[in-house]
Amino acid sequence: MANIKVFALGGLGENGKNMYIVEVDEHIFILDAGLKYPDIDMYGVDAVIADMTYLVENKDRIEGVFVSHGHEDHINALPYLLKQIPTRIYGTHFTISLIENLLSDNKMNIKHFKLFRINENKVLGFGDVSVSFFNTSHSIPESVGIAIHTKDGSIVYCTDFNFGPTNYGKYQTSFDKIIDLSKKKVLALLTESIGSGAIDRIKNDSLLEHSYKNILLNMKGRIIISAYSSDLSR
């Protein structure tokens, strides 16, 4: 039987600073590496990241960072991590592109780092352990769930997702792969809980177009619209 440990360095019981660790025997897998913006009473603090001391002390056992998507609370601690641990980073094409921009903004040469683009058909092997992926729907393109497969069963990581329909059909949840995972032995499901208490159905993004048209056509004054830079479809 494999010696399996699962714990969070950040993101558990808080919104942001996502970083989860899965250990399988001698292998360490890092799931996401994000930051958290400070509370209003944390004066002089620009961002909060997880304590990475344990990872630095065990850096020779780390197989890489497996990134679910490109939001700041899931990737923006990577520059701090990579300065201490030059490990491999795995993510979808769009996510890795965001990480490349992030590293460049931090004056870090992307050629010095091991950035690997994956898709949901990619399976990575690390001795007796393998890692697979499945597409999820989110407010950012190319988000994925991650499954770590051991000889005793799988640990499935699926954060920040929804099952709502989208108006950009390229990015959809892979229900077939989720069904395949459910047919195998799943030891643990690590999933997001924000919004889980809401009883309302998620609204289709295409409904925004109708709302905006009404506002734009009837408003006589100035209209200011905020946008989230990574939310390309909206």
State the predicted function of each range.
Residues 1-66, 71-234:
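His/Asp/Glu-rich metal-coordinating catalytic cores
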